[in-house]
């Protein structure tokens, strides 16, 4: 009995081909590619960045996640703000974030970056939360966070990137922000009001002294300089005379 040449069903060859084909969408492929190409922009302003620097070493080896530190915002898609952000540095941070290409992500690292930390109550120059300037994707609390915590934050960010939709990313709006305490500074009057310069001790002395002395100030200075010079001249002449007398005594003794 001869076997059927064209049996009903899939051939083994076609079955192997179907097993090797993966059906996906362009968005999923894009997310999968970006998982291993998160290039962080190093933005360390305080002590938290020391922990991030130890993450670059061989002990933790964050290169396995495809992280390549960059120094240019145009080549980075992840910025890790590590440390205190001051009022003067805020415009520079916003400009760096705007120069990064889309899609871009932010990790707020440390208590000082998230809420202002120990400077959140009585500091007039500290930004109380970097999310007031730029949108934050992952909050990493700690003072400072350990390198293991940084790795955990990167893993959570990778999960977010894997489930991301491009349209949702464009319509993203920062709504949930960390609570920060308002400052307790009391307004004080201005210090530089001119009172110090108008103080009598800061006034320039007049050219002449009291009118009862009948002697101008410049003449008194000149007379004091002349008396000092005369005293110096008399002392030098006296020293010369003593030196000559001593020399004559020594010469007479030799004779």
UniProtKB/Swiss-Prot annotation:
Classification lineage: Eukaryota, Viridiplantae, Streptophyta, Zygnematophyceae, Zygnematophycidae
Broad class of enzyme this protein falls into: translocase
Gene3D superfamilies: 3.40.50.12280
Presence of the UniProt keyword Ubl conjugation in the record: no
Transmembrane segments: none
Primary gene name: ndhK
Protein's recorded name: NAD(P)H-quinone oxidoreductase subunit K, chloroplastic
Primary residence: plastid
PROSITE patterns xref list: COMPLEX1_20K
């Amino acid at each position: 009995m001869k076997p059927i040449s064209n049996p009903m069903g899939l051939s083994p060859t076609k079955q192997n081909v179907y097993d090797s084909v993966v059906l996906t969408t362009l968005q999923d492929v894009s997310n999968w590619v970006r998982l291993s190409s998160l290039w962080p922009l190093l933005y360390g302003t305080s002590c938290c960045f020391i922990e991030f620097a130890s993450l670059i070493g061989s002990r933790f080896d964050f290169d396995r996640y495809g992280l390549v530190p960059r120094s240019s915002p145009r080549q980075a898609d992840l910025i890790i703000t590590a440390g205190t952000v001051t009022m003067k540095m805020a415009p520079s941070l916003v400009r760096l974030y705007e120069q990064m290409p889309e899609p871009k992500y932010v990790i707020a690292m440390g208590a000082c970056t998230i809420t202002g930390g120990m400077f959140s109550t009585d500091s007039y120059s500290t930004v109380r939360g970097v999310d007031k300037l730029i949108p934050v994707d992952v909050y990493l609390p700690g003072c400072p966070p350990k390198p293991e915590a940084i790795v955990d934050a990167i893993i959570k960010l990778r999960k977010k990137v894997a489930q991301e939709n491009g349209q949702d990313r464009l319509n993203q709006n920062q709504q949930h922000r960390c609570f920060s305490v308002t400052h307790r500074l009391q307004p004080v009057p201005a210090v530089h009001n001119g009172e110090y310069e108008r103080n009598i001790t800061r006034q320039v002395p007049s050219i002449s002294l009291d009118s009862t002395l009948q002697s101008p100030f410049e003449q008194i200075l000149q007379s004091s300089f002349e008396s000092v010079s005369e005293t110096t001249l008399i002392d030098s002449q006296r020293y010369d005379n003593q030196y000559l007398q001593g020399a004559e005594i020594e010469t007479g003794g030799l004779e």
